[in-house]
């Protein structure tokens, strides 16, 4: 793909706020929409070819990140895959990823309209209108986006390979667990980021780009060569290629 500089389209993300159309729950934070689209487009620019890609979030939590990218970048996507070691948030992720179809957005619009009539709150009607706008956009951009939801420990290469059976993600984009609201689970190695990268790379095609974000000044990936780094607000991000991770060794 052609070289990417930075996102120039200003995105009105109000329709994508947690709890408006997308489902939310305590303990599952949202992700900055502009940063999500910035990182995704940078990853696309690092791939060979120009066709639609498969996107995977192996620490998906509520599925918010994948759902937002699916709604904003339908034309660039072939499929999205969501996985997490904890099955608890996957129910919420399934509800959000169901919004990546016109039927799912229609159902959400009707739900919000019914709530507006029942409770007499303008905010519910506004949410219904947001669902309609998102449905119109998704339909115009290609319609329903295929999704898969699985349970897997991101530090278990065999489990990840099983999750991806029949699929070959081109882009991995995930927000690393942090602080008190989310945290690492599963068989966590002494160096979580390095372990995560090796585990992911072992299950990916060589050309795949792995993008991870964290609330830290700099995400450590050495000795792996970073394709690029960026920092927006409180989050840092780094992009690496699967082949480079494997070449760097354990």
Swiss-Prot record:
One of its GO terms (molecular function) is rRNA (guanine-N1-)-methyltransferase activity. Pfam families: AviRa. It comes from the Bacteria. One of its GO terms (biological process) is rRNA methylation. Its EC number is 2.1.1.209. It catalyses: guanosine(2535) in 23S rRNA + S-adenosyl-L-methionine = N(1)-methylguanosine(2535) in 23S rRNA + S-adenosyl-L-homocysteine + H(+). SUPFAM superfamilies: S-adenosyl-L-methionine-dependent methyltransferases. InterPro entries: AviRa, SAM-dependent_MTases_sf. Gene3D superfamilies: Helix hairpin bin, Vaccinia Virus protein VP39. Keywords: Antibiotic resistance, Methyltransferase, S-adenosyl-L-methionine, Transferase. The keyword Iron-sulfur does not apply. Specifically methylates the guanine-2535 in 23S ribosomal RNA. Confers resistance to antibiotic avilamycin, an orthosomycin antibiotic. This is 23S rRNA (guanine(2535)-N(1))-methyltransferase. It comes from Streptomyces viridochromogenes. The lineage of its organism: Bacteria, Bacillati, Actinomycetota, Actinomycetes, Kitasatosporales.
